[in-house]
Amino acid sequence: GWLAGISYKIPEYYFRTSLTYRSAIKHEMTTTESIEVGVVTPNVMEVKTPQSVNFDFMTGLPYQNILYGTLRWVNWQDFVIQPPKFKAVIDYVAIFYPEATDVKLIQYNKDQWSAKLGLAQVKKKKWLSTMELLWDSGINNPASTLNPSDGYQGIGLGSMYTYNTQFDIAAGLYYLH
């Protein structure tokens, strides 16, 4: 895969923006699957992670405030994980139950969009406090172990104290719904 981006900044306004593209990445891996019915399949599996686009911005506001945000798109629409022996079992079951043909171990049918908008305030050059609003479209799959959420809205609060140039202490809290 590859990554490309463009960035622009105006230091005197503390303005910075960037647009980044990450290509899909094809992975080929060896798999070890156990099955008792004697189905013989290749031990190599291919997974293609999706392409994505990120847009980020940050700008200074009066009274040592900073407005920042991100917008992200991920092309999950055609993402599938289907190990070879799992596919062989599904193909066999589909002989008797044709509706099983489309069953995949993991399959996402919708692209994902997410956004964040935040406001940060610098206090006495040592403290930074933030508040963020978050949104994620999800990918239209039910939540599971492999897909821990299907979209959310949320709010986040954070704070950071800069002790010196080599040591910071930070804490944050998000509420997602």
Which residues are covered by each model-predicted region?
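Outer-membrane beta-barrel porins/channels
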Residues: G1-H177
